[in-house]
Amino acid sequence: MMKLFRVIGYFSQLRAFIGFKATCTFTLAYIRNKISPPQESALAHIPVGPYVFYFPSISYFDGLFSEIFFKETYIIPYTDAPIRVIDCGANIGMSLLYIKIRAPHAQVMCFEPNPAARLVLEKNISENNWGEDVQIFPYALGKEKGITEFFVEDKVATSSGGSIVNHLEKRGRSLNSYSVEVDTLSHYIESKVDFLKIDIEGPELGVLEELVAQQKLRSVAEIQLEYHYIPGFFTRPLSEMLSLLEKNGFHTFVEPTAPPHHVVGHET
């Protein structure tokens, strides 16, 4: 019974995003993918409102879609304005899908160093004709430019948990690694940024410190980020990040979830 109530609740939430008819279409396509999943290495797809979203497996879709649409990880009010958004850690494009549903004319910069995830991201951009509005940059982000190894789970090539540190190996996970370029974010910010999303599995504080050093954080109106404390690798406390943001004119909201997400915005 509780599961039925949860499904009804999810249906109502999605209807608020894309309308009743589109939610029915989505539900039928979702059930088809559950019953008859795509062959290994083939991409599945589901219509989500006016768009079609491609993904490697229904279980992978479940996790990302639930986090972003049902748990409402991101909060962007609906707007027709061409807002400027930076998506750090775009993965296969689920956050981009949310952005485009909430702000259809948004101009978005996507950063994604994982080549497998980036291929699916490119597919979603191409199939939905977002090419004029969306740019992809194949870089990891950090406090300094350079070259580093990027680690991804062997069993999930598109994993959203890819990181520049191999902390998952200590948990017994088998990892693949790629050599990737690390870039700094500041020189991509030349004018106001309406929304900055950061989910990069560890180096969040370094990215923000670089923006402060280059006097670019003041150009950002709102930030949502996922803070990662990774023992042995990224161990600076959350209080340092909150202090940095507050010193630069933001007020902060901390939402403890698993993993924790944090929404911050300028004081008014």
Regions found by a protein language model. Give the residues of each.
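Phosphate/nucleotide-binding beta-alpha loop and adjacent structural elements of enzyme active sites
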Residues: 1-268
